[in-house]
Swiss-Prot record:
The gene is gluQ. Zn(2+) binds at residues 97, 99, 118, 122. InterPro entries: Glu-Q_tRNA(Asp)_Synthase, Glu/Gln-tRNA-synth, Glu/Gln-tRNA-synth_Ib_cat-dom, GluQ/Sye, Rossmann-like_a/b/a_fold. This is Glutamyl-Q tRNA(Asp) synthetase. One of its GO terms (molecular function) is ATP binding. Binds 1 zinc ion per subunit. Keywords: Aminoacyl-tRNA synthetase, ATP-binding, Ligase, Metal-binding, Nucleotide-binding, Zinc.
Amino acid sequence: MGTFQGAGRYAPSPSGDLHFGNVRTAVLAWLFARHTGRRFLIRVEDVDTQRSSLESAARQLEDLHALGMDWDAAPTYQHNNFDRYEQALRNLPHYECYCSRKDIQEASRAPHTIPGQYPGTCRNLTEVQREERRQALAKQGRVPALRLRADVPTWHVRDYYAGDVLGDVDDMILRRGGQQPDWAYNLAVVVDDAADGIDQVVRGNDLLTSAPRQAYLAHLLGVPAPTYVHVPLVLNAAGQRLAKRDGAVTMREMPDILPRVAESLGLSARTLPGMLEEFDPDRFSQQPWIFAIHKEV
């Protein structure tokens, strides 16, 4: 193992108990950090205040501790970092967006638009047009969203497993509008990773398409992008992403969860220290793990 002194992290969203897929990703994040001589940190991603709860966060931290997982500083919480995001926003080119979700969906059906990307409806409005839309929202008790004014269509990142990745960059949301403005995930995660010294991000490969956007934000903010490691998801028998509706899949419902995580990683050890001794990231399978509810270890 190396002696590099960067940091990896696990950053759960506290909206419920950790399930098998969450625990597997947490273990992989810990293994990668320790294998490369990095510190390991926990950040509670409760930037979405309406879906997060301190009770869920406490239960998740208890579960990670019960696995034998350790971290090198007290867990941090995004709800304490809003001043950071406000400061970052001041350093980013942005504009107000008055579109509803329905507006964006309808605009995205127009010819020559890229599915899933914001079509730029509010990007070049005149100040008179902006004031009209601002007042219309105010009558509804809402405020505009804030979007990045991106000056490139794509951005390049390198992932440990996927290699070179060129991904789309659009005018992404930085702060959501509505009755209660919320900071957007892409901005929050980039700002927090930089502030916390995170230089290794291990997470599910469903987030691979977010990496170019986040790396571009890091570039605009003048901070280094982390090394990305996107790992396969855990799927149910139907080939869909594992969810709580699939049955007894949470850690608290599975007393044998760590041995099963080890099995899914091709490791024979049944403790985290033992798994670390065996772990070789270059031998880790890149195929999704199919979770069998009643499978015996």
